[in-house]
Amino acid sequence: VGGTLFLYFNLIYLEDTEMDQTKTFYITTPIYYPSASLHIGHAYSTVATDAIARYHRQRGVETFFLTGSDEHGQKIERKAKEAGVTPQEYVDKIVAGFKDLWKLLDISYDGFIRTTDEQHIKAVQKMFKKLYDQGDIYKSKYTGHYCTPCESFWLDRQIEEAGGVCPDCGGPVELVEEESYFFRLSKYADRLIQHIKDNPTFIQPNSRTNEMLQNFLLPGLEDLCVSRTSFTWGIPVDFDGNHVVYVWLDALSNYITALGWGSDDDSLYNKFWPADVHIVGKEIVRFHTIIWPIMLM
């Protein structure tokens, strides 16, 4: 976890004190989902990240600014089928539009990761196998509610509390039963709670810290589904060909695979990791401040 700070992107914090120019600075945007063209919210978080990156560069700090695209999943597979193209062709076209927009806005990113990059795919497979071998991933069966647009699974009580719809987007959910691999989030919940309490600036603003603790961590975490068998557009689990890696391990790990973690050249990883700031939108705070830190533990 290190010293990473998660900033909900309507708040920007800049230090006025003189910076140590011998240090490095690593800042990221979320990686964006190419199911459609980007909108003002994507631009907002990216411009905010760009401003912070430029601030550090201007003060002589060696800076790495990462952005990218999260390209796998059932929604992409369905969209590509509707468009009459392959999933790869579908994302290639939309990601080209991402880069055109960042060029138009003069975004000064240092790295652009695509989760279809071969380096990323191999690193994710390595991570999945490592977690499986150490007993943190196990195979079971999932029965419950699934929202395709949000790529989120929900318990019965969560759907009931939301009035029968997805608690995040308000859209319809479907009941699914599927063999899956699960990650033992519950094993690390107490450790993450203590880390958040020991590091009060870990998540900002503070209202988001309270939300994560009161709504998710303190009531207790369920183990996390990390593979799917109902679609094929994803990174294959290399020791079980019926499964593809689900979004959590695939997308969230981009912050280290983009720096070369799991590859033959991890020089950028050794130089810049851990990240100093992850800029995220409010709808993905839970994934970045609970799932991602636990993955790193």
Predicted regions and their residues:
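A glycine-rich helix N-cap at a beta->alpha junction
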Residues: 98-108
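A charged helix-plus-loop insertion that forms the helical arch/lid used to bind
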Residues: 79-92
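Residue-identity detector for glycine
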Residues: 2-3
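Structured secondary-structure scaffolds
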Residues: 20-67, 119-123, 169, 175-297
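Aromatic/His-enriched, Gly/Pro-containing loop or helix-boundary segments
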Residues: 90-93, 108-122
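Feature captures the FAD/FMN-dependent oxidoreductase FAD-binding
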Residues: 119-135
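Cys/His-rich short segments
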Residues: 136-189
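Short, Lys/Arg-enriched N-terminal segments with co-localized hydrophobic residues
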Residues: 6-18
